[in-house]
Regions:
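Bacterial Sec signal peptide processing site at the extreme N-terminus
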Residues: 19-39
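Extended lipid/amphipathic-ligand handling interfaces
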Residues: 67-70, 91-93, 166-170
Length: 208
């Protein structure tokens, strides 16, 4: 059973896979339009829900709670829980405010990064997760992209983290991953989202 302390640790990190055998660092110029269209669609996707599991590893500690994430524009609601609903944790946020509730414990801060810094003493790019989970590098930030032979983005490096996308599925014409690995060698840090089931707006499809 996942303890409440472990789930609190996992939830803090949240407020922060092998690649295809045939890959290239960048597609030819005349094929860039495929990724350009996909990235534009992902940027416009600001309302979505997902369910799955997330394995959180940091400094040799590891936990795997279930996750339900509702995202509406820049506001989000993330629920984490373990076996038999143990350690039920709720994270809610919007620009300028974020809170975490677990039982009778309540924490709040101006940003998810600030909350992690207050509670754990770590600086992590948590605000990037809303982009990375969709398979989208944070716009206007340097990133090294890796594509497969279908010109699908399968991995990228950004802000000293490596993000690997796998089990790509079609959701009403939009490609989204069912697994996302986010890793950094420092502190042996890893977030592994698996079994993701996405629900998109009515003009998109729900896929599993």
């Amino acid at each position: 059973m996942i303890g409440t302390g472990a789930l609190r640790l996992a939830s803090m990190y949240l407020l922060t896979a092998a690649l295809s055998a045939c890959t290239s660092l960048a597609p030819p110029a005349n094929e860039n339009s495929i990724w350009a269209l996909q990235s534009q669609q992902l940027e416009k996707l600001t309302h979505w829900q997902l369910r799955g599991r997330v394995n959180v590893r940091y400094d040799n500690e590891s936990q795997t709670p279930r996750i339900q994430w509702q995202h509406s524009d820049r506001a989000y609601r993330i629920r984490l829980w373990g076996t038999f609903n143990a350690g039920n944790t709720l994270i809610q946020g919007e620009p300028g405010r974020v809170s975490l509730d677990q039982g009778d414990k309540h924490f709040s801060a101006n940003s998810p990064e600030e909350l992690i810094l207050q509670q754990l003493g770590y600086e992590l790019p948590i605000s990037y997760l809303e982009f990375w989970i969709k398979g989208l590098p944070v716009p206007d930030r340097p990133a090294a992209l890796l594509f497969n032979d279908l010109n699908q983005l399968t991995s990228f490096e950004q802000a000293d983290w490596t993000i690997t996308l796998s089990d790509l599925r079609d959701y009403g014409g939009l490609t989204l991953p069912r697994r996302v690995d986010i890793m950094r060698s420092e502190n042996d840090a890893r977030l592994r989202f698996v079994g993701l089931s996405w629900t998109l707006p009515e003009n998109q499809e729900t896929a599993r």
